[in-house]
Each structure stands twice: as C-alpha cells, then as structure tokens.
Amino acid sequence: MSAEVALVYRVLPESVEVDIEKLKNAVVNKLAPKYKVDKVEVEDVGFGIKALRFFIRMPESDEYSSDEVEELLRSVEGVGSYELEYFSRLSF
C-alpha cells in the first residue's frame, strides 16, 4: 500500500462580507474531484473575520502536489489568503 500525505491549510476570506459557508463549499468542490477533504474547521479570528482550516489527504505520487492544491485555492473566488500549516507523510 502506498503512503499518503496529510496537509492542513488555513484559508482567510477576502473580506468580512464573504459568506464563510459558501466559501467552504466552493473550496471543497474545487478540491474534491482529486483531493480528499477529511474535515473543515471554522475559526474566529476577530473583528468578524473567520478562517477556514482544511484537512486534506492525497496519495504520495507525482500526480498530486501541494503546489496544485495552492493553485486550486487561488482560483476560488473569495479566497483572500492561505497558509500551509501542516504537511506530513502518512504510512500504514
């Protein structure tokens, strides 16, 4: 069995006006065809701003990359910024 890679991205919306649930769904839908989103957490940042934390799993393969995940995040309307918080190889 091949190993997998776990990624955790923290995503901030462009502004406080962005609907956080719509943004969450848009990101999940953009990633879902290829990447497995295990969990999404909503975090209060302050001043009415909420951040989203995406827990993503992907096979360890040349066909998958964090660069591609970041390209997909950039392409979602409403995403202001993102940060890779965690990257680890999983093997069972």
Curated annotation (Swiss-Prot):
Superkingdom classification of source: Archaea
Keyword field: Elongation factor, Protein biosynthesis
Function: Promotes the exchange of GDP for GTP in EF-1-alpha/GDP, thus allowing the regeneration of EF-1-alpha/GTP that could then be used to form the ternary complex EF-1-alpha/GTP/AAtRNA.
GO MF annotation list: translation elongation factor activity
PANTHER family: ELONGATION FACTOR 1-BETA (PTHR39647:SF1)
Organism, as annotated: Pyrobaculum islandicum (strain DSM 4184 / JCM 9189 / GEO3)
InterPro entries: eEF-1beta-like_sf, EF1B_bsu/dsu_GNE, Transl_elong_EF1B/ribsomal_bS6, Transl_elong_EF1B_B_arc
Name of protein: Elongation factor 1-beta
Pfam annotation, one family: EF1_GNE
Family statement: Belongs to the EF-1-beta/EF-1-delta family.
KW Disulfide bond (keyword) present: no
Name of the coding gene: ef1b
